[in-house]
């Protein structure tokens, strides 16, 4: 690369054809490398010798599910015992018990009847007792200019 002539600008290199020569040179190099890499990798191939006897073929057994009362259960039937259907009153009683255990109250109506004491009450002051605010709405700039009112 030291003996290569370097052009002053890319325009001179394009006019002299130097860029084209370099591109063709790089293209040839990449094509050579790709040809080398296209050859399949050398992997050792194991050839089995037919003269040696092979072991017996593997045996496949098809197993069935265990029978219950002499009947093979089909995949669609469920083997779980059916849960007894609970009445509405039983479900509500269980719900109330769980709610009492978790939240400490048996029904949601009890909470609604109680006023919420956690929030502090807001004390409103009459308009005339409030102190006037001394906020300057349109400040002046540091140099005495009109600040935000300044038009550009």
UniProtKB/Swiss-Prot annotation:
Biased composition (Basic and acidic residues): 89-100, 113-130
Domain SUZ: 42-107
Record keyword Acetylation present: yes
Domain SUZ-C as annotated: residue spans: 111-152
UniProt keywords, alphabetically: Acetylation, Phosphoprotein
Region of interest (Disordered), ranges: 30-152
Modified positions (Phosphoserine) in chain numbering: 37, 39, 51, 105, 107
Modified residues (N-acetylmethionine): 1
Biased composition regions of type Polar residues, renumbered to the chain: 66-80
Keyword Acetylation found: yes
Pfam families for the chain: SUZ, SUZ-C
Domain of life assignment: Eukaryota
PANTHER family per the UniProt record, alphabetical: SUZ DOMAIN-CONTAINING PROTEIN 1
Family: Belongs to the SZRD1 family.
Protein name as catalogued: SUZ RNA-binding domain-containing
């Amino acid at each position: 690369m030291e003996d290569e002539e370097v052009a002053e600008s890319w325009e001179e290199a394009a006019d002299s054809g130097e860029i084209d020569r370099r591109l063709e040179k790089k293209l040839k190099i990449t094509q050579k490398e790709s040809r080398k890499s296209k050859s399949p990798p050398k992997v050792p191939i194991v050839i089995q010798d037919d003269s040696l006897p092979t072991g017996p073929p593997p045996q496949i057994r098809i197993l069935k599910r265990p029978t219950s009362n002499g009947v093979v259960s089909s995949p669609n039937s469920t083997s779980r015992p059916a849960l007894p259907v609970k009445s509405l009153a039983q479900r509500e009683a269980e719900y109330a018990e769980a709610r009492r255990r978790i939240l400490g109250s048996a029904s949601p109506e009890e909470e609604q009847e109680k006023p919420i004491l956690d929030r502090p009450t807001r004390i409103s002051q009459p308009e005339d007792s409030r102190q006037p605010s001394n906020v300057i709405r349109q400040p002046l700039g540091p140099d005495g200019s009109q600040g935000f009112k300044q038009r550009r």
